[in-house]
């Protein structure tokens, strides 16, 4: 179960109430009155915990679990241990996420790191022209610049700087040591520690006798329900804006260049870099360490495998991989042929044998 020093659960709940709140069903209606006090993995859960099984790889852990209750797909119901009450869901992991949010709402929406919510710490600095909504939390060392607007119930973490003119919507969590400049953030945005948003894009007119800096005159627009992982960077536009679409989730250590436009619901995994003026459609997935060159389009629903190097436009709904990135079936065939070639060379067989 979660360490109570860091993660304090809300009040215990009955399985009947949980099932109702997440839109799932109990395998046995008589279990509706059973109480659980929190969530935990299958291998560490106790009799008062609720767990889940989503990946069949963990079926053995499910058969041996001491959890009091478990969320499972109906196909696993008949093989459940006798001691485990079941909540049935076609999407167990999603259902578990909803339950974990119920028990730990602060973790789902950002937890302040110092003091109580709704307080402005005496060591926070707020410009007289800034406008703060009700219930705003400012932690020690926060600086709020001229003309800044912050929505209701937003938390700004320790030593974070919000530059002049920026706006932050309601119910946001901006973690410690973040810098925001030239940026507008929507509602329910979560920004993890160390993120940099709105700094200069990397723009230079290159040549002799020296490289001339091009003033970056755009902004960063972060729409509602976006999450940006620790130590990621989002450069402001050179003239057009850099845009992060609604519901997009960005992992740690991601670089997003100037003028990039990212659609709704995209997933961008750690150490990915997106060069300037590239456009991503809706629900694009970029796996870890993907590199994307500038001035191209990755259309909606496309997926790029880890370490892929995207140098051309990617059609909608396609899976690409490799260096340079290509349709994933083609890339896999190339990998197989290279392995065959390597074996032939080691054995001294000619390639056409």
UniProtKB/Swiss-Prot annotation:
SUPFAM superfamilies associated with the record: Trimeric LpxA-like enzymes
Involved pathway(s): Bacterial outer membrane biogenesis; LPS lipid A biosynthesis
Please give the Pfam families that the UniProt record associates with this protein.
Hexapep, LpxD
- Gene3D superfamilies named among the record's database cross-references: Hexapeptide repeat proteins, MurE/MurF, N-terminal domain
Q: Does the keyword Metal-binding apply?
A: no
Q: What is its EC number?
A: 2.3.1.191
Tell me the InterPro entries matching this sequence: Hexapep (IPR001451), LpxD (IPR007691), Trimer_LpxA-like_sf (IPR011004), UDP_GlcNAc_AcTrfase_non-rep (IPR020573)
State one molecular function term (GO): N-acyltransferase activity
Q: Where is the active site?
A: 258
Please list the reactions this protein catalyses: a UDP-3-O-[(3R)-3-hydroxyacyl]-alpha-D-glucosamine + a (3R)-hydroxyacyl-[ACP] = a UDP-2-N,3-O-bis[(3R)-3-hydroxyacyl]-alpha-D-glucosamine + holo-[ACP] + H(+)
| Entry keywords, A to Z | Acyltransferase, Lipid A biosynthesis, Lipid biosynthesis, Lipid metabolism, Repeat, Transferase
Query: What are the annotated GO cellular component locations?
Result: membrane
Which domain of life does the UniProt lineage start with?
Answer: Bacteria
One biological process term in Gene Ontology? lipid A biosynthetic process
Family in the record: Belongs to the transferase hexapeptide repeat family. LpxD subfamily.
Q: Relate the protein's function as given in its record.
A: Catalyzes the N-acylation of UDP-3-O-acylglucosamine using 3-hydroxyacyl-ACP as the acyl donor. Is involved in the biosynthesis of lipid A, a phosphorylated glycolipid that anchors the lipopolysaccharide to the outer membrane of the cell.
Q: How does it assemble?
A: Homotrimer.
Show the NCBIfam families listed in the entry: lipid_A_lpxD, PRK00892.1
Question: What is the name of the protein in this document?
Answer: UDP-3-O-acylglucosamine N-acyltransferase
Q: Which organism is it from?
A: Parvibaculum lavamentivorans (strain DS-1 / DSM 13023 / NCIMB 13966)
Gene name tied to this protein: lpxD
